[in-house]
From Swiss-Prot:
Belongs to the cytochrome b family. The lineage of its organism: Eukaryota, Metazoa, Chordata, Craniata, Vertebrata. The cytochrome bc1 complex contains 11 subunits: 3 respiratory subunits (MT-CYB, CYC1 and UQCRFS1), 2 core proteins (UQCRC1 and UQCRC2) and 6 low-molecular weight proteins (UQCRH/QCR6, UQCRB/QCR7, UQCRQ/QCR8, UQCR10/QCR9, UQCR11/QCR10 and a cleavage product of UQCRFS1). This cytochrome bc1 complex then forms a dimer. Heme b b562 binds at residues 83, 182. The gene is MT-CYB. GO terms for cellular component: mitochondrial inner membrane; respiratory chain complex III. Heme 1 (or BL or b562) is low-potential and absorbs at about 562 nm, and heme 2 (or BH or b566) is high-potential and absorbs at about 566 nm. This is Cytochrome b. It is found in: Mitochondrion inner membrane.
Amino acid sequence: MTNIRKTHPLAKIINNSFIDLPTPSNISAWWNFGSLLGICLILQILTGLFLAMHYTSDTTTAFSSVTHICRDVNYGWIIRYMHANGASMFFICLYMHVGRGLYYGSYTFTETWNIGIILLFTVMATAFMGYVLPWGQMSFWGATVITNLLSAIPYIGTDLVQWIWGGFSVDKATLTRFFAFHFILPFVVSALAAVHLLFLHETGSNNPSGIPSDSDKIPFHPYYTIKDILGALLLILTLMLLVLFSPDLLGDPDNYTPANPLSTPPHIKPEWYFLFAYAILRSIPNKLGGVLALALSILILAIIPLLHTSKQRGMMFRPISQCLFWLLVADLLTLTWIGGQPVEHPYITIGQLASILYFTILLVLMPITSIIENNILKW
């Protein structure tokens, strides 16, 4: 009798994706982040669903409904903090996943890579709209400042901003539509993730050496299911340590003050995972220029496959490129720090230098270094 998991139409898809999937035998822990992102997404959808049962998207009651969740709903506080800190874990995994792709040359799978960039944009949009929902000071002013950036678009900018707001300022209409989009987008992310996986399984996984691994494959289950479970346990442990011991570590104290359109906070800043892009935005004195730089800071990932000049796929055997990669990581950490600082000397200059360095590494130094390394190897 043929095994049902190999014949049943639905079970067959799951079997070919998670059980009998031929996987390179040498993929490291850096390949765990895909499954961790899946776990984060499921966790966010579930906690978000329970929060949505008690949340009201009205300017007069939004803040108090979040307070009500934390004070009166059974285990509401843990659901709320798991959702808030789950977003942080989501972005940590996302950035590590993208970093892995850059380091090991996974961007040569262009379809998978491009769907991944769309996923990144969608998750960022979801997180931004979610941050507006508690209707605290930083929610309100963050929404005002970021949506206002669209007014830099020539000719249609002002109309576009008012269309998004549903009025002449961030108000009830804005909050209601942000809640609607914040609810629906995670399901769009789920669908895109399935497409991401579909394209990945067309080519098979990359591996640390960058060499085709068709001659050395092992089944996904049990080897990588066990490995992924270990990763998941470490993820949940980290998340719960954050939630139970310092749930507000990554948040902003200003968001515990109800939104007040008449009082601007001294330092308006987004959540920590957007600070690097915010620093790039602020480092350009011109509004339109800043908005373009902000968009390009992520869109630049789309042209990385075109800038691949090395004869090797990954950076495993390319020490000079490795140095540049870690310089890029340090630069992004610097930008993240600068994004959270006030706009004054010396932070402005540091931010501008770090922004220039970010684009220079990706657009100029990495392709040139790859050519130099090719010549060193005399290939």
